Design a protein with these regions (language model features):
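A residue-level structural signature of the nucleotidyltransferase/glycosyltransferase Rossmann-like core
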Residues: 116, 197, 204-205, 277, ...
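Conserved N-terminal catalytic core of the sugar/cofactor nucleotidyltransferase
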Residues: 1-9, 16-120, 124-130, 136, ...
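Short coil/turn connectors at secondary-structure junctions
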Residues: 2-5, 53-55, 81-83, 111-114, ...
Length: 479
């Protein structure tokens, strides 16, 4: 096949269904599974398995997730670092804007004949070879200008997924699509399963870039024109492209299913020849762990006494369960979830209640990743806040000051280059400095190993919005 395959990874999420591990700033693609790999890393592995030799892997993600994604890719596939290109969204707008902007980018750089394979970054697929075979079957149909969806043969009457009803058989093991259907009730799902004519809609697609754009011009011209305006409004000569905020937000917020696939004429479905799990609940996560004789599954340190059918994931503390059954217990450093396993889909209701209270556990973990490294909150009191900062070699924090707090820095490991006012000094282990309120300062790691530093803040407000950046190598100074 002469048409090059360009994978388009969609990485994002709101962090509701798998709270407290998944959060707004740390969505599902960054979660680690039982084998220690993140869903994002596994998606990248699949993308590289089907991409044309030397072709880029295009990733659409949020601006706030770029540096984490970049580092995850570098760790997962260091030899492929130069092949990555990123399209950064200033806000989430559902899948149609992301996919149309990706198709416009691919058409510009590789021609409208290039085949785009859309891969959500939060699916678990173990059989990479089977996945690649299915993608190549879909690509063969896409080369004939079909818009291809990948459907998963159902093994149960699932009410949490949309379905695709297949019609007549096509070449390459595909079928024409008769219609897309919404998430059904249980009785309808049972009928779908019994008929053998329905597939789960996996949210994975394959098409020539120009074929999608042509279909969008007919099905949703207003969405395409807004996407095209954003595309033209954005500088595109770099490996990292950040969409202009106003023109991006002008694109209607709609899924690619509603905008294009349900209205298009030449559409096909390829049944998946691989295992598939969208990891959409803690029940799905638990199935990745090995059960004991009583059906309990444990990740982390836990003791279960007279317990049956429970799942425990403990990240920072030992967990003990006594005389209970069918519970999911998820422990993190700052939040604990206890839910009946039959109510796993309702976790998002708890998250909504916490967000209504502006609870920080819905936004971020105690350890927060930044372009330069990370920080972990050790103490958060009304009059002080203590953090442990880890700065990667060669990285530098922004030149900044604060209105409402002073800071004390103490080096625990490594060497720190510190600027306070107009004075620069080098600090070694067990040395420190004081930064008065309102004084410009900067921290840098000039060494070849991680710098570890304890930061003690004193004042009456410690929010991240009390950082006034004057210079920043990561582009975080905005007018």
């Amino acid at each position: 096949m002469s048409d090059p395959i360009v994978p388009l990874i969609l990485s994002g999420g709101s962090g509701t269904r798998l709270w407290p591990v998944s959060r707004r700033t740390w969505p599902k693609p960054f979660m680690r599974m039982a084998d220690g790999a993140t869903l994002l890393a596994r998606t990248l592995e699949r993308a590289l398995a089907v991409a044309a030799p030397g072709a880029p892997v295009l990733t659409v993600t949020g601006r706030d997730h770029y540096f984490i994604t970049r580092d995850e890719y570098a760790a997962a596939a260091p030899a492929a670092v130069e092949r990555h290109r990123f399209l950064l969204e200033p806000a989430a707008r559902n899948t149609a804007p992301a996919i149309l902007l990706g198709a416009l980018d691919v058409a510009d750089r590789h021609g409208g004949h290039a085949i785009v394979v859309v891969l959500p970054a939060d699916h678990l697929i173990a059989d990479v070879d089977g996945f690649a075979r299915s993608v190549h079957a879909g690509a063969a149909l896409a080369a004939e200008d079909w818009l291809v969806a990948f459907g998963v043969p159902p093994d149960r009457p699932e009410t949490g997924y949309g379905y695709i009803r297949r019609a007549g058989a096509l070449a390459h093991g595909g079928f024409e699509i008769e219609r897309f259907v919404e998430k059904p009730d249980l009785a309808t799902a049972q009928a779908y399963l019994a008929s053998g004519e329905y597939l789960w809609n996996a949210g994975m697609f394959c098409f020539r870039a120009q074929a999608l754009l042509d279909a969008a011009a007919l099905a949703c011209p207003e969405v395409l024109e807004a996407a095209r305006a954003c595309h033209l409004d954005t500088p595109r000569d770099a490996r990292v492209i950040e969409f202009a905020g106003d023109s991006f937000r002008a694109i209607p917020e709609i899924s690619i299913d509603y905008a294009v696939m349900e209205r298009a004429h030449r559409r096909a479905v390829v049944p998946a020849r691989f295992d598939w799990n969208d990891i959409g609940s803690w029940t799905a996560v638990s199935e990745q762990a090995t059960p004991d004789a009583r059906g309990n599954r444990v990740v982390g340190e836990a003791v279960l006494v007279d317990a049956d059918g429970c799942f425990v994931q403990a990240e920072t503390r030992a967990v003990a369960l006594v005389g209970v059954s069918d519970l999911a217990v998820i422990e993190t450093a700052d939040a604990l979830l206890v839910a009946h396993r039959d109510r796993a889909q309702d976790v998002k209701r708890a998250v909504e209640a916490l967000r209504a209270k502006a609870h920080p556990s819905t936004e971020h973990h105690l350890t927060v990743f930044r372009p330069w490294g990370s920080y972990t909150v050790l103490e958060d009191a009304p009059d002080c806040k203590v953090k442990r900062l880890t700065v990667k070699p060669g990285q530098v924090l922004s030149l900044q000051y604060h209105h409402r707090r002073s800071e004390h820095w103490t080096v625990v490991r490594g060497t720190a280059k510190v600027r306070v006012g107009d004075v620069e000094t080098l600090l070694e282990r067990n040395q420190g400095t004081f930064i008065p309120m309102g004084v410009v300062h900067r921290l840098e790691n000039p060494g070849s190993e991680d710098l570890h530093l304890i930061e003690t803040q004193c004042g009456d407000y410690f929010g991240e919005d009390d950082i006034v950046r004057l210079e920043d190598v990561y582009g975080r100074v905005r007018g």
